Amino acid sequence: MKKLLWIGMLIVSLGARAQFDAAFTNTWALQSYYNPAAAGLDSKLNVVGAYSLQMVGYEGAPKTMVFNADMPLFFIGPKHGVGAAFLNDAIGAFSNKKIQLQYAFHKKFLGGRMSIGVRPALLMVGFNGSEIDLREPNDPAFATSDVKGNAFDLDVGLRYTYKQLWYAGVSAVHLLGPTVKLGDDKLHEVTVEPTFYVQGGYNLALRHPRYKLAMDAMLRSDITNWRGDINARLLYDGEKHKLYGGLMYSPTISVGLLLGFDFHGINIGYSYEVYTGGVGVINGTHEILIGYHHDLDVFKKGKNLHKSVRLL
């Protein structure tokens, strides 16, 4: 028998302040999603999609999908990058969507590249009140019908990348703290708190030239709550394909396993995240990652090696 978990009702009532952002395991592959300054950072068209099915076995548990693409604008100059993303997040009776465009400017600095990015977005929040059986049907905290609304949002980011060796960045999303008013009567609302991200990563070359150790870390906080994520992947760089396997750890929250491969610019990955708070091993999070990267630098000589700072 399925366990019941009305996350949307138990955690957030309409009129409360909600933490909007979903947590993905493969943060290393979604760098421009978390920080707009990473858009068009290398000479690639980067397309990635991730689907996360969290807390398997619980009804109403989060199901999140994100699609993100970015590229440099070579006809203007490699200093400019653009991107777009779409997020669809379902949590119990709530549905959250976000459509965003992003622009980044890159400048050579101290042997690396300093980047600054901005991302305007449209937030769309819905609440399926008709699907909820309330003990007190007249509770003003909840809508009893299906309601939805939208609001303008804005994200900004700053990042420094040193060759393909290491990077560090900070970003602020929901910078304006938008409030989404739901329904025609606007009686209910959801306020999205600003959230801040700090990211960093380092690629360590091993003795064998075909192996590398990629380490990434991210800390996110909306001032009230915080979450840290650390992952390490062992990469095998073959002549025609790449393989990786690794581990992730989020203090006080979860541990997980990462697996994947890259073949001619196509990356497919899988991760399983187990919660350490007593949820149960079989009630973890499955995440599927599918990506594609292709060299766009028409002035570069030689073969397309499909190398990307996101995958190394």
Feature annotation, model-predicted:
Residues L4-S13:
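Sec-dependent N-terminal signal peptides
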Residues Q19-L312:
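Subset of outer-membrane beta-barrel
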